[in-house]
Amino acid sequence: NQLALADCEFVLKLLPSQCTKQNVQDAISCAKDCSLVVALGGASICDIAKIVATTLDLDFILIPSMPSNFGYFTLDSFCQEENVYKKIRTNQAYKILVDENIISKADRKQVINGQKLVLSLYEALFSCQFDNLFYNNKRDLTNLKLQLCKFKDNYEYLQSDTDDSKLVLMDILIELAKATEDMDSINVFDFAFCLKTKSNLPFGTLCLLASKILANLYKQTFEIKNIYKFSLPNFDVIDQNLSSLNINKKSVNFTPLKSMFDNSVYKKINAIKNQCLALCENLENQLSNFSLPADKSELQLDDVCKVMNIAPLVYSCSPLVNMIYGIGLLNIC
């Protein structure tokens, strides 16, 4: 009504609650003659709006409908295409409007489910970051840890279903969003584990097979590839950050190797190798109920590539793909 009174022409589009390639294309066709995109809804609506506005180079305003939505405060969106979730970098929103009336009226059951999901996602994110010695992204892990503790400490209060508790939840999520830009990756990874590729093998099984194959290729690759210092992170800085957080580095062997590579480069490579082997072990424990094919040759290369591409987390946090990226097996744009 306010838009009509202001003599604004507008297109009202009710979008499906899933960010798929087709839904995005439909939304783009509706918005191609518009000068502004305004999105009111949950995470999927937010993702669609961000992709549409970025594609058409339009300003956009986001209005979250749930206090547990965190996609509004990041620059990434995730769009499902067939069996793959693609991570799309989007423009910054012109405005993010948190309406207290909308947030306070959010459904209690959905809010609690959202809280549980967010808590598990951030715990997984924090765990991934300090377990992965090859993680080369400057983030304030201490702030992330503090915000996570704050979330836990206030968890019971946040379930009280009061207007104030929902607003407190939104404030905490905004702080969590500031602590890291890639928490949506954990969400996508969680979904990806439920998907199956065309080979009908569970995603986790493909991860395990891929990690085993890559671990076996490690020695051969190390011998034939030129390793350049600029392609590796500052391991000393990472080591200092981990030490300040009392991180357990038991899976990494720091024994120097007398070879053509200097000690600092070798320590980096050795850490990557051991993280890859540790990932294999972790996956084996997690997938103990799966029966793996006896003949590893049955695994097709394109299926392994699907494993690498299906979850953005594999690129942003996984020691497995960081390992093969660091030694030149995989080029990531």
Where are these regions (language model features)?
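Catalytic phosphate/nucleotide-handling subdomain of diverse soluble enzymes
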Residues: 189-240
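C-terminal charged capping/lid subdomain of soluble metabolic enzymes
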Residues: 224-333
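Glycine-rich phosphate/diphosphate-binding loops and the adjacent beta-loop-alpha structural elements
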Residues: 137-138, 150-190, 194-197
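ATP/NTP phosphate-donor binding region
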Residues: 1-36, 112-113
